[in-house]
């Protein structure tokens, strides 16, 4: 580890660089100059070190001081975080910690070619999540898919254009809105509930979830406990959050989300007496939602809806139907 107060004791060689908060190592195969390394199997292995250093520091400042994934007295104040660049064509990038002491990153050149370094923002998010445990401030549920969802949210905070830059996540999410919250199919696609929570409780609240998360809980249980919410109140909040996802009514990213507003569809099967039934393949799971587009009526028209929730219906997945419940309403856009 590199103690910033005793820099003369750090490992020094020609394949190392450092910033105020990071020390960067690269493998021997690169040679001494990351801007002009030997090719590997005909592929360029160049790394824009100045841009990497700049973005690392920018993300670090935001994750530490704005999102508060570290607090004063953290080991971050004593040690630089570590970045290891592997001379490899593998597409792997990994954020975590080194020896349970300080946040660290392991990356390859093909993951740091975009100028914005979205991959670095995501993986450094994992490093800061791990830092909470390194600092002895919490156990963060012992790990779960919520970590990926959070890293996407952290990336979205430092890059408001994330939905466009990684549009494949949006393309997937809009077909998976019915999935249960925290479903593994959506952990990379859907940081949107965290956006709602951050607005509702303040940005540092997400890091506090990690500090307070206990083994045996999941993030929903922790959230309810921290906010003294019963099941009914939590369901009301989730309904409100999902309504915001229709027109993306978030001030921070209002401009950036306009191309994705009001873009959902929902497969409905005609039923008897004029009813329409949500198809089994997109029927909502726990905290999932359907957004059903409606024709806009003439001004001054009254709009009514009849809704019937059916639990345990044949042909649909049914788990604990006795606990089923629904929220429904209109979203005017």
Model-derived segments and their meaning:
Residues 18, 186-188, 297-299:
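Solvent-exposed loop and beta-edge segments used for protein-protein assembly and interaction
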Residues 216-333:
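Beta/coil-rich, acidic/histidine-enriched accessory regions frequently appended to metallopeptidases
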Residues 13-19:
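Short acidic-hydrophobic surface loop/beta-edge motif
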